[in-house]
C-alpha cells in the first residue's frame, strides 16, 4: 500500500510539471443586480420582513479563473482549472480563506476517460467541470429562484475538497461518472471528517438528455473539536431526470429522494426568518419533484418551473430520535425568469420566485407549529 501511494504522488507531480508548458487561459464572469425579497413568517403580531438590496451572483456566480490543457500525444492530455468566486457588490471573496473556492483541480484525459484530483463541484449540481445535475431550467443557479437544491439538496455541499473524479469515454451517448472526497484538509479519510461519494450516468442522443445520480455523505463518527463520538446517520440521495429539446420548447422533469438529509440549511437567510427554523435544523426523509421548461421568446430565452417537496422527521440534529415526535414539512416552489443577450458576452435578465413551507409538527405533548 505504501508503494502505491508513492507512485500516485509521482504521477500527479509529473502532470503538474508538464502542465506548466501549456497555454494558460484567463476567463471570468461578473453578475450584479438588485433584488427585492419579502418574507412572511406567518406568525401572529409579527410583520413581514422586506429587503431591497444590491446583490451579486443572482444569475450566475461571479468568478475568474485560469485553465490550461496540454496535448502529450497518443491521445493523452493533461490540464488544470483554478477558479475563484467573489462578490461583485463589495469585492469580497465568496468563501473565506479559500482563493480558488469554486474549483482547483488537476486532470488527465486519455482514451480510457478522465481522472481529476482536487476541489470540484459535485455531480448533482450545475457548477464545475464535472457537474451533470441539469434537472430543471434554473439548475442550482439564479440564486433562490427556481433552485432545485430547495427540493432535494438534503444538506450536501455544492463542492468538496480532496475529490477524485473519474469520467468514462462517451459510449454512443452514454457516460458514467464517479466521485469520492477524502474530506477536509488535516482530516482526510479519517473518522473525524465527512466524506462524499457519488455515482452518476448520462445518456444524450439528439435532443434527449437523461440523468441519474446516487450520492451519499459518510458522516464523521468522531468530533475532533469536542473529543466526543458522533452518532448521526449517513445521508443518501437518488435523483433521476431528463429533458428533451424540441427546438421551440425544452421541457424538464426530475424526481429526487433523500434519506437522513437536512433541509433547513438550503434556505440561506430565509431560514433565519422562518418561525419553524428549529424544525428545519433536524434530519428528514423525503422526496422532491420538479417540472420546468425553457423556450425562445422575443430574441431571448424564457424559463419557468414548479417544484414540490415532502419530508418527514427522521432524527434530531445530533442523530438521536425523540420518541413520539412527528414532523412533516411540505415545500412549494415557483420560478420564472427571462434572459436577453445584448451581445455574445453580455446579457440582461429578470426573475421572479415564490417559496412556501408548511410545517405540521407534534411531539409527545402534542405541540403544534404552522
PLM region descriptions:
Residues 198-335:
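Detector for outer-membrane/organellar transmembrane beta-barrel domains
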Residues 22-36, 51-185, 193-209:
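Outer membrane beta-barrel
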Residues 16, 52-56, 94, 152-154, ...:
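Outer-membrane beta-barrel proteins
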Residues 1-23:
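Gram-negative bacterial Sec-dependent N-terminal signal peptides
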